[in-house]
Structure formats: structure tokens, C-alpha cells
Amino acid sequence: MKPLLFPITVILVLAAPAVLRAQAATDSGTFVLLHARDTVALEQFSRGPTKLVGTLALRNAKRTSERYSAVIAPDATLPLVEVTVREGVDSGPRKAKVVQRARVIFKQDSAAVDEVGDAGLMTRVFGTETGAVPYLNLSFALLEQAVRRARLTPGGSKISFFNLGGGQTIAATLSPLGADSVKLDIGDIRFHLRVDSAGRVLGGRIPVQDVVVQRK
């Protein structure tokens, strides 16, 4: 599968009507990624009981943005995820250029990828691990999904990620790091994440990259 962006080495309301309870179950926010105090990316996301959507906007020369939409299963896996990569920004009648679209369907230990790019439509099937979580470089909303998945899995210190930027499956380890934090080792990259009791990521760091993540 053509890389989507970068390789892996980057770095409740009580007694409320049903509609209000549904709204309370929806969580949204923005992750701000900083390197040496400069903003390198912004990720806006919304997570409901059955769907996770977000846009990761990179502060690069091409003004790349990646919009994703994923189905959330009861076990916190994401059996279907769609990603659209665009370059530039919408300006009046001129729209940002769509450079790639991809859809990934997970079933047991395989991932079927439909990709539309410059070469047309391409379909590939990759081997992976059952329950693997999609990994999109710099997406902390997807890392949060992995934390939520781990908390629902017996002995959930081990997590598998399916790299959307290459099709590899990467083993990861989740370990406690103080009362309100965890460390997540994905390959040789370590993430420090501040989390709450529900598994929401409140902020974090990538120490080796000198990247700080704030949630707003």
C-alpha cells in the first residue's frame, strides 16, 4: 500500500432523556502537537459510541490534511476505517486537492485495503493480528482508541497496530507510568500519555522527538 504520509519511525447526565444521554456519550476535542514550541499538527476529532471521525492537519509546505472515519465495535476495535488525504486548503471555488483515498476493512487476522490514487484503484489484502488498531502517524485520537481497546482486553498490556502508512503490523506495549499516565512503546518509539479513568488521552509527549501534545 502506498504510504499515506510518513513511516512508523516518526515519530453524564443522570435521569436525562435518551437523546441527551446519547449526546453525553459523544466526546470531542483537539490535539495540538508542538515541537520546540512550534505547532506541527492539529487534530480535531469526535468520538461517539459507534463512530470516530477526525481531521489531522499538518503544518507542512503542502498543507496536508488527513480526514478519517472509523466504525467502533463493542470491543473498541475499528473494523472499518476510511482515510482521505488532501493537499492545500479550500479557498472559495478552489478546493484542496485530493491525492489519496483508502478504505481498510479488518476481519480476524487480515486487513483488506482499497486505495484510490494516481495509479487508479488498487486492492490488497494484508496479514495482521486479530484486534489490531489502525495507526495513523501523529494521530492521538487513534492512540486513545488503542488505550480504550487495551482496557477492555484481559491482560491488555499488549497491543497490535496496523500501520496505515505501509501495511505493517507493529507490536506495542502499554505500561503504567504513575497514577494518571501510561507509556506506550510502538516499535522503538515511546509515547508518554496522560489519561483519565475512562481512557481519554489528556495530553502527552514523544520524548525522543521532543514533541509535546496538548488536548483542548
What are these regions (language model features)?
Residues R59-T64, D188-F191, V211:
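Solvent-exposed loop/turn segments connecting transmembrane beta-strands
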Residues F191-V208:
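Short, exposed beta-strand-loop hairpins at the edges of beta-sheets
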Residues Q23-A25, D38:
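Boundary of Sec targeting at the N-terminus
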Residues P7-P17:
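Bacterial N-terminal signal peptides
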